[in-house]
């Protein structure tokens, strides 16, 4: 009867058991020697502290306890495939790993530096000394086209149209003169902007 009973505590595995463990591919580093009695082995789990048997705790030395130094599996990776939401855990993990995180729960996010505005091709040509043709400003170009259209409509001979176009042309001429003075004030270098000839009031037919 006594021989049929299983012995208490940890025992040394048999040769067949050792061969079976090696065949299964269990790493020998997972077996730690816990008891001062030679030949007693115990398999432990990754990341846990190996503790001696409670029956031998009094007789064993505290120096027998050894911490498993094998790499631990990430807590987030272990929950990745079982449908558990790890958003809160991941946020705490990221906040704890940042150097700008403070214990009171306030942390800062480093923003990107402001990007410099790209240098236009015109500015590059001007800085290199190349001569380029300046474009006419949009308001001035609009007034010039409007004046040309007004002149064509003026020749239609319709009295109401001619009256409205004459008033519009006078206002356009006034705007052109003001715009030229404004452009000259903003160009201290003295660059000359070529303007198309605007017909004077003397050359216009009387209404």
From Swiss-Prot:
Main location: virion
Keywords: Virion
Disulphide bridges: none
Statement: the UniProt record of this protein carries the keyword Protein biosynthesis: no
One GO CC term on file: virion component
Any one Pfam family match given in the protein's UniProt record, by short name: Corona_I
CDD domains for the chain: embe-CoV_Protein-I_like
Keyword DNA-binding applies: no
Localization in the cell: Virion
Recorded coiled-coil stretches: none
InterPro entries: Corona_nucI, N2-like_embe-CoV
The protein's role, per its UniProt record: Structural protein that is not essential for the viral replication either in tissue culture or in its natural host.
Family under the similarity heading: Belongs to the coronavirus I protein family.
Miscellaneous comment in the UniProt entry for this protein: The gene encoding this protein is included within the N gene (alternative ORF).
Protein's UniProt name: Protein I
UniProt source species: Rat coronavirus (strain 681)
